[in-house]
Amino acid sequence: MDAIVAQLNIDMIGRNRDDKASESNTVYLVGSDRISTELHEVNRAANAGLPKPLSLDYEFNDPADLEQIHFRSDHYSYAAKGVPIIFFTTGLHPDYHANTYEVSKIEFDKLARITQLVYETGVRVANLDHAPVRDNKGPRAGRHTE
């Protein structure tokens, strides 16, 4: 575990939250600032460098979020051991864990843009001459969008 400097997790990135067209540019980030604010800043810089930056939303990162998504996905076992993480998601939708999910509902352009952001973030982390600083400042409360 000591050799792992960060964990980037993607889950449910091909749809818009609640299938709202207004969410077509949004990706929700969870945990990016909880363990390492440096990792958070690396991700923000990677997004700013994209040809078409995404709207970064931290609503699900709020400790008061009722869904408690920070504790519900594959990244959490790393975070619990102190590894800086970012969970990229587009939120829940009507077909979440249902048999009504169809390929025709996937927003492939959005999926590709988010995947590019994850890649660019990973490359920037890999090219650091140090592991992202683990300052453990914790999440920012409230909804934040960039």
For each of these PLM feature ranges, what is it?
Residues 89-146:
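His/Asp/Glu-rich mid-to-C-terminal helical/loop segments that flank catalytic regions of hydrolases
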Residues 1-87:
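Metal-dependent peptidase/peptidase-like ectodomains
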